[in-house]
């Protein structure tokens, strides 16, 4: 009896193997491909490189870090967590405009180039010292059109504008139509901190003074240029109470995102 059962099971196993082999042969004739669901993304990474992004008010692994360096970490994490086939462009926001550094490229084929470009992002890339975010997002919309590549815009900024928005310099955004294609990513802390100032050799020389607008034309100020890029010894605050203080202007960015129907994270 036992021998008969074993013989029967052995026959069933051999039959099953033969059927599976036949099915595999049939599948091979049609050259099948396995379809895996991938998270394919396309992002226009936009980084604020204004001087306020040199403020050191974030912490990574128990060590203080500047806003710009924290942004670099975020950029790398976003790229690393995206699948091959995802596309990224790298852009910078300066004053009232946006400049493209790398046009949209596929992640895996251009990984080293993307990482190298992120590592080199810094304040000396700026050609002006002022910061007008409302002008910047309009410029970002034009840049997105010129790149001719559908993508979401991730705008990394602390929201610290110079000059501050008021009734005189406020920009009308009624015609802005990016909506959910734009996401503000707030970078910085809630507590105001002084902003480090560097000279033309990128050496720390002190902190920005609170009088940064005094010598500028116009009642609202403009911080049109930053001589620190060209001077070995730019002026700095001489006392703690003279320092210009900066923070993450989260409420302003949230208000702005609601106004143009975009997102803030």
Language-model region placement:
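…and closely analogous acidic/polar surface helices at protein-protein or active-site interfaces
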Residues: 40-41, 53-87, 106-110
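Soluble periplasmic/extracytoplasmic beta-strand elements of cell-envelope proteins
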Residues: 42-52, 87-93, 152-156, 181-185
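DG-centered beta-turn motif at the end of beta-strands
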Residues: 48-50, 140-143, 149-168, 185-189, ...
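Second-shell loop/turn segments in exported
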Residues: 57-66, 101-104, 121-129, 239-244
């Amino acid at each position: 009896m036992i021998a008969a059962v074993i013989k029967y099971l052995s026959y069933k196993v051999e039959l099953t193997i033969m059927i599976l082999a036949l099915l595999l042969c049939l599948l091979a004739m049609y050259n099948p491909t396995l379809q895996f669901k991938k998270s394919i993304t396309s992002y226009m990474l936009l980084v604020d490189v204004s001087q306020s992004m040199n403020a050191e008010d974030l912490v990574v692994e128990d060590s203080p870090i500047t806003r710009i360096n924290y942004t670099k970490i975020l950029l790398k994490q976003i790229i690393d967590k995206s699948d091959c086939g995802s596309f990224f462009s790298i852009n910078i926001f300066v004053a009232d405009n946006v400049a493209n550094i790398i046009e949209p490229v596929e992640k895996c084929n251009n990984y080293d180039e993307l990482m190298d470009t992120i590592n080199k992002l810094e304040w000396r890339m700026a050609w002006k010292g002022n910061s007008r975010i409302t002008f910047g997002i309009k410029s970002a919309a034009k840049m997105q059109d010129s790149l001719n590549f559908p993508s979401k815009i991730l705008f990394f900024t602390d929201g610290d504008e110079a000059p501050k928005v008021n009734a005189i310099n406020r920009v009308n955004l009624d015609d802005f139509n990016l909506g959910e294609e734009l996401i503000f990513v707030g970078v910085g802390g809630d507590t105001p901190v002084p902003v480090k100032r560097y000279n033309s050799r990128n050496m720390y020389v002190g902190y920005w003074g609170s009088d940064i607008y005094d010598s500028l034309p116009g009642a609202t100020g403009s911080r049109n240029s930053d001589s620190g890029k060209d001077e070995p010894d730019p002026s700095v605050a001489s006392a703690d109470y003279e320092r210009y203080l900066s923070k993450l202007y989260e409420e302003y960015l949230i208000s702005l995102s609601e106004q143009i129907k975009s997102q803030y994270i």
